[in-house]
Amino acid sequence: MTDLEYVEHCLHIPDPQERYARFRDDPRLRAILPEVYALDGVPQPPAYHPEGDVLAHTLLAVFHLPGGCGRRLAWAALLHDVGKALTTREVAGRIRSFGHDRKGADLARAALERLGMEEAPVEDVVWLIASHMFALSWQIENLDRISRRQWRLIADPRFPILLDLAEVDALAAGGNPKKMAQVELYRKARLRLDIGV
């Protein structure tokens, strides 16, 4: 089994607790994915991340993956915050990780190419990671306030996977009701596009 196959096997362990424990404890995974385990001890703002450091958040994202999810979502959940290891700073007494989405996309590309993943899924995972902060930046309360630019993102064929990533990300941070409501609003927006209303 190649390293890529091994990680994918672990990402698709049906029991979420077993999957979580594997990623927490397996030395082979630590050797294969130094980008992920560099997140150990990287702080996050407790008000938004009561679960702890970035590695704890990442392991919970892996835990919350829905059964039978596709490889793009699984890899995006695993790698979505790897950029925080390089971007996290204290700014004016607050923990910030400006640009972690873009830096994380670059790190994810390098890791996935190193592991030998095909180009198309690499591009999709990179796009998901680069785009995963959209929900935080939009803060839209009703569909009539969505801009043309935002509708273009919603129309992207990968957007439903991005919504699944946003949900997994929110669940890994304690399932904040406001974040979950945002995900549902964006699902309604996508449905509106899909049915042409």
Task: Name each region found by the language model.
Residues 1-91:
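Acidic/His-rich, divalent-metal-binding segments that scaffold phosphate/diphosphate chemistry
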Residues 5-6, 18-22, 28-31, 35, ...:
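Exposed alpha-helical structural elements
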Residues 28-31, 53, 100, 154, ...:
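A generic short alpha-helical patch detector that favors 3-5-residue windows
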Residues 31-32, 44, 93, 97-98, ...:
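Alpha-helix boundary/interfacial micro-motifs
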Residues 63-175:
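Divalent metal-dependent catalytic cores for phosphoryl transfer on phosphate-bearing substrates
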Residues 139, 172-197:
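Terminal helices and disordered tails flanking the catalytic cores of nucleotide-processing hydrolases
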